């Protein structure tokens, strides 16, 4: 059962509603919890057998402060959807809305993964992940793509572990090859931070190959590329920009 934010994205709600209909047609087992204003979700749910309405009168705008919006707009589609997962009323949540609000709401309302460190269980910070097509005909997982501009070494290790799990479970890659984004492939390359991450990832991440460069997002030499949110977002946007330029020129 998937909860969908119908007021997220630039062309809401019609594009989102069209997407829900396409998903229902493609998968007879899927059920949808449509979250949004009553005047949108109630008639839509009434006309679709596998759709239930989740009335959410508040709307988090793209330019809202993410943390403040999550704490004050408690009846927004993003917050109520995350709470639906927490309560077991949904298995997954999709939104094309505010990335920051999604991250903040997931952290606040969905029980995070935890790991043992310094004698207590620490929450794992969420990271943004996507799978990019590569020249070998497969996909390369990039994480983090922008959720966490400032991170610690332990965070990078967890990102690598989560990225590897995603590559195995979702992409079916039995032994993912993991790379650390740096300014060169040599072990000694990188900033002081990436140099600190290197031995930690080598010790804790099976399949860790070593440093990789921005070109390895599409080279096919790595299945998972790990970066802090700032570097990962820059690498992603640079790749997108280059692709758009080439398509325009060809």
What are these regions (language model features)?
Residues 1-68, 74, 83, 87, ...:
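Anion-binding alpha/beta catalytic cores of soluble intermediary-metabolism enzymes, centered on
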Residues 222:
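Conserved beta-loop-beta/alpha segment of the NTase-like Rossmann-fold superfamily
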